[in-house]
């Protein structure tokens, strides 16, 4: 039941979900591309001679992961804010808060999985470009090549799952514990234009 209703809700709120999906996809792509750069055998071979390169790649990867956690958290809060009125309506017609929460989690699971998979694909192409940029900086002869890094993918999956899972748990807690009137009031605050 959740999955069918979740897909219908995604179709109905397609404009908002496209923004959300693109944001998550780009976040996953950036995380993967920087991690793939760090796991690249060519870059690792260059890094043996240049400790500063290793430090730079690690710092950039950490910065991208740190910024990604804020972007993912904001994206989830954005979607929750856009949907609070709808969730309040569901509860007013008799749906339990637990069911509403599970519906939101199902919708976000579909979107998050799709965004991660597409982000991994986009990130693979982007990692080839980043690899080329690094080789240009250090004047190393090269050709553009795209290669998939299973290690980078696994670490990206772990980071993405932790950040996305934490954000979804926070959103689920809000849905479960807020009263209907609070959901409606928050929706009014969220959608009303500021003076």
Please place each PLM-identified region on the residue numbering.
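Juxtamembrane inter-helical linkers in multi-pass membrane proteins
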Residues: 178-189
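Conserved transmembrane alpha-helices of multi-pass membrane proteins
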Residues: 49-62, 66, 138-166
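Short helix-coil transition sites and intra-membrane helix breaks within transmembrane domains
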Residues: 66-67, 76-81
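Conserved small/polar residues in nucleotide/adenosyl-binding loops
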Residues: 190-195
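Conserved phosphate/oxyanion-binding catalytic-loop motifs
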Residues: 87
């Amino acid at each position: 039941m959740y999955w069918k209703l979740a897909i219908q809700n995604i179709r109905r709120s397609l404009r908002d979900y496209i923004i959300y999906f693109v944001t998550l996809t780009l976040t996953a792509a950036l995380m993967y591309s920087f991690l793939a750069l760090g796991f690249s055998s060519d870059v690792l071979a260059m890094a043996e001679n240049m400790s500063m390169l290793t430090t730079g790649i690690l710092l950039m990867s950490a910065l991208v992961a740190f910024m990604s956690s804020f972007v993912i958290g904001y994206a989830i809060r954005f979607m929750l804010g856009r949907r609070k009125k709808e969730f309040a309506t569901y509860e007013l017609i008799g749906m339990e808060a637990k069911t509403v929460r599970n519906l939101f989690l199902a919708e976000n699971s579909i979107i998050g999985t799709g965004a991660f998979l597409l982000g991994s694909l986009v990130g693979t192409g982007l990692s080839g470009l980043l690899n080329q940029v690094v080789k240009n900086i250090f004047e190393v002869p090269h050709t553009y090549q795209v290669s998939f890094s299973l290690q980078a993918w696994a670490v990206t999956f772990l980071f993405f799952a932790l950040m996305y899972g934490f954000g979804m748990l926070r959103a689920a807690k809000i849905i479960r514990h807020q009263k209907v009137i609070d959901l409606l009031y928050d929706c009014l605050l969220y959608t009303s234009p500021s003076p």
